[in-house]
Amino acid sequence: MKTEAKKAVVASAAMSHTGSAEPATDSPPAAVRDLGRGTEPPVHVRGLVKRFGRFRALDHLDLEVEAGSVHGFLGPNGAGKSTTIRVLLGLYRPDEGSVSVLGSEPWRQAALINRQVSYVPGDVALWPALTGGQVLDALAGLRGSRDAEREAELMERFDLDPSKRVRTYSKGNRQKVALVAALAAPTSLLVLDEPTSGLDPLMERVFTEEVARACGEGRTVLLSSHILAEVQRLCSAVTIIKNGRVVEHGDLGTLRRLSRTRIELGAAADELGPVRQALEALGLDVVEDGGRLSLEVPPEQVPTVLSLAGEHRIQDVTCEPASLEDLFLRHYEEV
């Protein structure tokens, strides 16, 4: 898929090829700036079906990303994430369903829409004979707009040497070129597919800070990542897909509250016995280990469990809401 990845970076991520090189300016054309200003969300997908022969990669998938948010898009390899993203970029046409990106069907107005979409894939393929700076120049020329000051700031933050040729870059440095181009471009929507692949922990932190900044500036981010902690830090909402279908969607805080809470109670063994009996009478699975009781509690039973702990004067009580990893594994550990 490296050829397709390069096509996506050139045609979308940085940067739509309109058929002729245009001078880089400080702002996109007025027609582009007006995209996505209506009431419709920047990304609005309903009943999306995509088939490859007899294989149904996407099966009536729904996805909605609110303006100005960072939205996590999760699923293991083969779940349909990359196929969905390629439909959003106009590289694939859907077989069924409706898809709107910034108010338009991406395969019908690809050149116009892609000027407002920055895309970063997980495996960036660039022109090996060019320097990093020349790649950024080329991408800015194809887009027709550029913020040179912001670009320079990002190169410094990501510790990117633009004078070196792409063929000498590590995977992480190639990733940095795409991130600098995407974040510096005056676009309203960023589609990031495993964007921190190849980055070290320090650069991952810089990435997190820059995405938060982009969101603070009113830009919309669709983030697909296998690093669940990264998604949990950045995203206000998530969509989890499995076998081409959505299995979980919504505000991350709400999803965590609606999931089981992990509760631990600590006390002497003779004090825990009556509490354990009361908890098991509620139908809860209780694990006792080293003077502590551990259990996962549905949201509607959390007040009852805490009340029982109070009645039995258990003072060592810890509650831990479900993490994003818990939500994810709940669906993918099912047979």
Task: Describe the residue ranges of each PLM region.
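Short loop/turn segments at beta->alpha junctions
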Residues: 131, 251, 271, 298-301, ...
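Extreme N-terminus of proteins, especially the signal/transit-peptide cleavage junction
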Residues: 26-42
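ABC transporter nucleotide-binding domains
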Residues: 40-242, 247-248
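C-terminal coupling/interaction segments
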Residues: 2-14, 18-19, 23, 299-335
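Short acidic active-site motifs
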Residues: 109, 251, 304
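ABC transporter nucleotide-binding domain
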Residues: 207-296
